[in-house]
């Protein structure tokens, strides 16, 4: 109708084709939109206002689970992503040794920090571009897609060229200029939840990335700050079913940063899979006692191997494929 054509010119329209129906989402100022103008069309089943400020991320706009492809590894939709590796890239020998070990255990992606955002300016800041080349060498050696953190837009072009899954850390979850820049790449984005972020704030950060043109977003729960100081953070297991209710995006869990202690990783990883997580990102180091970063929360390769064997039954029980 003329009215609907007029609205179309004022609003941004997104079409999502599901298995049973097609959803047309109108994004913009919809306050003055009269649903009755659309309900008279026999091909329209119903018209509804989405109350939440995030639209593209919202399950109401996209009922089917999104499956993100990371260089051939599926995340979401019944696939369990297993991401593992050292907190920091320290040397080529170290990374390749760990990469081979975690792959043998069943991991399907390799993590490693080349650029490290540290609370203290005196802590190890990472090897930078040299570390990125080491990760690429490990991928060449093992075939594992690589996951590493982008801290600044100035490196986006090289990350777009070399990195399979670009991680945005908790500190940058609300760095909106950086999030908007991520629309320039079609590389998948792993968006970690900020340590003080509400669910809505987390969803809105994902919305920034998607609204800028990149639909390939994976959410990551890594623990939030509470009054408790015994653990590094508090893992919000509720976030897994909450996110699955609010959004169609896959959600993975980082039990290493959540607890900050290696012996907490095992039970929290198992609990995360049981709660419906689409993946785990776990720090593994062949010599945690000499690690340059976060050795206390890293598993040794043999412990990681045991963990994955024990997770298999849990994953099967909740319909996840390892």
Give the label of every model feature segment:
Residues 52-83, 309-311, 316-322:
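N-terminal amphipathic alpha-helix/helix-capping segment at the start of soluble metabolic enzymes
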Residues 70, 185-284:
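Catalytic alpha/beta core domains of metabolic enzymes, predominantly
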Residues 2-7:
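Short, small-residue-biased leader/transition segments that mark boundaries at the very start
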């Amino acid at each position: 109708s003329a009215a609907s054509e007029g609205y179309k010119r004022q609003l941004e329209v997104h079409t999502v084709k599901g298995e049973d129906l097609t959803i047309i989402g109108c994004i913009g100022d919809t306050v003055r939109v009269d649903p009755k103008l659309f309900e008279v069309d026999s091909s329209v089943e119903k018209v509804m206002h989405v109350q939440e400020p995030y639209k593209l991320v919202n399950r109401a706009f996209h009922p089917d689970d999104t499956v993100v492809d990371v260089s051939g590894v599926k995340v979401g939709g019944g696939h369990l992503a297993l991401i593992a590796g050292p907190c920091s890239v320290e040397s080529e020998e170290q990374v390749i040794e760990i990469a081979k070990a975690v792959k043998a255990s069943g991991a399907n992606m390799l993590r490693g920090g080349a650029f490290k955002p540290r609370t203290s300016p005196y802590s190890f800041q990472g090897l930078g571009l040299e570390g990125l080349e080491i990760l690429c060498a490990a991928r060449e050696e093992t075939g594992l897609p690589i996951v590493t953190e982008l801290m600044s837009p100035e490196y986006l072009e090289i990350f777009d060229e070399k990195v399979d899954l670009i991680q945005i850390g908790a500190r940058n979850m609300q760095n909106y200029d950086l999030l908007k820049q991520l629309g320039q790449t079609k590389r998948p984005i792993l968006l970690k939840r900020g340590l003080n972020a509400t669910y809505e704030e987390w969803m809105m950060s994902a919305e920034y990335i998607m609204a800028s043109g990149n639909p390939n977003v994976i959410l990551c729960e890594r623990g939030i700050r509470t009054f408790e100081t015994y653990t590094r953070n508090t893992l919000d297991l509720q976030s897994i079913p909450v996110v699955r209710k609010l959004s169609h995006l896959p959600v993975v869990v980082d039990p290493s940063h959540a607890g900050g202690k290696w012996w907490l990783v095992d039970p929290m990883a198992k609990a995360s899979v049981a709660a419906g997580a689409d993946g785990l990102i776990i720090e593994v180091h062949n010599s945690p006692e000499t690690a340059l970063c976060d050795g206390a929360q890293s598993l040794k390769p043999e412990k990681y191997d045991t963990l994955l064997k024990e997770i298999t039954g849990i994953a099967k029980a909740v319909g996840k494929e390892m």
